Amino acid sequence: MFIVFSSFEDQADSTSPSFISKKYALEELMTANHRVSDLFNAAKAHDSVGVIQKFKEARIQYKKVEFYLESYESDFTKFINGPPFKAVEFVGGGVDAQKPHGFQVIEELIFDEASPNYDRIMDECFFINKEFIRFINIIEVNPTSDASIFLGLKYGLIRIEALSIPAFDCPITLQVAEEISSSLESINKVIGFYADAYESKPTYTTIKATQKQIKEAQHYLEPSAGHFLDFESLDKLFFIKKHLQPINANIVDIFESIRVETPVLVRLFRYITHINRDAKNIYDPNFLDNMATAEKSYYSINKDEKLSPDVIALGKKLFNDNRLSNKNLMSCKTCHDPKLAFADGLPKAITNQEGMFQQRNAPTIVYAAYQGRLFT
């Protein structure tokens, strides 16, 4: 359906692990593009058995490159394998509900109807192919770095833990084990490129230990290993604690070692993201970029400016000042008490009129600080 030619041209050192990782990602993305074309052809032929098989193959292949795409353009991936619901975007001061696209939409078209909706499946395949080609072109013309590669690895592990294990991104097929194993295979491959580059460095030992951990995690997911029979019997908490968390912790250690061993990369590692890359698992209290302690914050409106002690002190003063209200009776703290997780603990929020209440409660502003970035 689509033919893509690539020369893998880049100004970076063609022997560097970041360049080799980029080349590998392009190859896997092109393969994913072909798998989607195979699905398109099966739908065009009204092959009900082939559509199911080609769909599963296409998404498993996509999982090999998903982590890399996340590090480039996270908004891109939600239109490839995001939930089959309209995405709310804030555009020009208004709200725009965008139509969902991607693998999960196809999943519903195949399994949630009496018979596959072949025309719509073909439309979705066309959309995915078009987006893959767009992204191939973006990757080819943009240089990469160790910083972006390791950010992608971290994103990949987060996606496994938050989306793949609970089957959030494969809710009907429930092919959790196969898709996680595919993601881990790709992560292991990329880490291997760094093993080759750092063979004479202390980092090498940690890299090889991480590769061993990944292989053990993949083995756990193999049906022949006998650890589970189906999605329901998969011990998800055990898999997270025994396998994913140690892998994630080692990725952070490797990341730090490369930063130390290669001083020129220090500046590249400091660009702002919405997660704390030093957090070793998603349950770390500082997993999200902490605007109270960070020099700069992804979640701050002025994220390009340093959060100085004076700015923080001013914010606290304004937060507690009743004089900013209409009748000098209320402050932000009135409805968002720090002692109550910045909520009010009431069924319905109070107003500045005695005995009158709002139609709803006052939600914690901790969530409000993250909402615009996390849920759009």
Residue ranges of model-derived segments:
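Amphipathic alpha-helical interaction segments
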Residues: 62-72, 325-326, 339-343, 372
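Active-site-proximal structural scaffolding
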Residues: 180, 240, 308, 325-328, ...
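Electrostatic cytochrome c docking/interface patches
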Residues: 21-24, 41-42, 47-48, 296-324
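Bacterial Sec-dependent N-terminal signal peptides
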Residues: 1-14
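Short helix-capping and inter-helix turn/linker motifs at the boundaries of alpha-helical repeat units
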Residues: 29-30, 305-309, 356
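Mature extracytoplasmic or organellar-lumen-exposed domains after removal of signal/transit peptides
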Residues: 11-291
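The canonical Cys-X-X-Cys-His
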Residues: 58, 315-339, 365
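Electron-transfer interface patches adjacent to heme c in soluble/periplasmic c-type cytochromes
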Residues: 275-278, 282-304, 326-330, 341-376
